[in-house]
Amino acid sequence: MLDEPLFNVSWILGRFCNYSCSYCWPYANSNVPDHQDFEVYTTAIDEIKRQARANGFTEFHFSFSGGEPTAYKKFGDLVEYYANDYEAKYQSIHLTTNLSPGEKWWGRFIDNTSHLTRRSITASYHAEFANEKDFGDRCVQLIEGGVFVTINQVMVPEHFEEYYERCSRFADKGINVTLKPQSDPTASRIVDGYTDQQIDQLQTGFPQNWKGEQIMQMYLEDAKGNDYGLDQAERMNAFGFNKFKNWTCNAGYQSCIIRGVEVKRAYSCADEPLGTLTDGFTLFKAPSKCITSSCVSSADSKIPKVLHEG
């Protein structure tokens, strides 16, 4: 987002999920379908791109999550609609998914997104429901199809060692792994219960690689102009670097989040929404001050921010 005129959308399609994990926040999943009509979604894509282009952002990254996004019956069609925009010279897509669909579904996803600049997936492994071998096979299928995959493992403190060992087995197969600290039910802080060694593992474990080389997905620049690379946004939470109140932030101007029908500037910000998918929304025309005391969502923390001294 620093190098390209890229507009970022983080989209929770709904809370409907085919899993019900014991550690999931109660408000983050539902067994009742809550998706909107297909035309509501396609109209939103078109309107976001129109307003973003008016702000000078001509390239796009859309990230879909839930709930479980693939549980939406027309999600494959929605991905195809988004991907078939040949006006944008750069388009990328990201999914956060439990990989529950079968090989055929993912084959269609690979084919329908093959022309995009970048495709990536956060594959959330949930030990209460997933089969380790089948899950690994889907990851390998996607990687061989040119999709950047990282397994996301919520590191529940009381199961830390078990989960770490399984993540090591995935890493041995050449699959990237992200160790995600568990947040409290309000999603405002990391839970207690981690040892110092476990904190170190969260901060440094499993560097991200692509085609045999370590990659950096975020950059920080200090007041002296020194650059620091991070291979994944979750490192910021692991290090506790997530307090940006009064920084100037591009959220709402170069990005937006969609949660249900609400369009907001960020997950962590508690101000009024920018609008809704059904009644309309308006993006900011310029960067604005951060208003939240803690920014624990990686979707928020990766948006460009500047701290002006004085």
Regions found by a protein language model. Give the residues of each.
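Short, solvent-exposed loop/turn segments at secondary-structure junctions
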Residues: 18, 69, 100-101, 128, ...
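Accessory C-terminal segments flanking Radical SAM cores
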Residues: 188-310
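Glycine-rich short-loop/terminal segments
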Residues: 25, 48-51, 59, 223
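Acidic (Asp/Glu)-rich catalytic clusters
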Residues: 51-54, 82-86, 108-118, 137-146, ...
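Conserved C-terminal portion of the radical SAM core fold
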Residues: 118, 130-229, 233
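Distinct, well-ordered alpha-helical segments
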Residues: 74-80, 102-113, 133-137, 163-166
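Core AdoMet radical
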Residues: 28-39, 56-72, 86-104, 113-134, ...
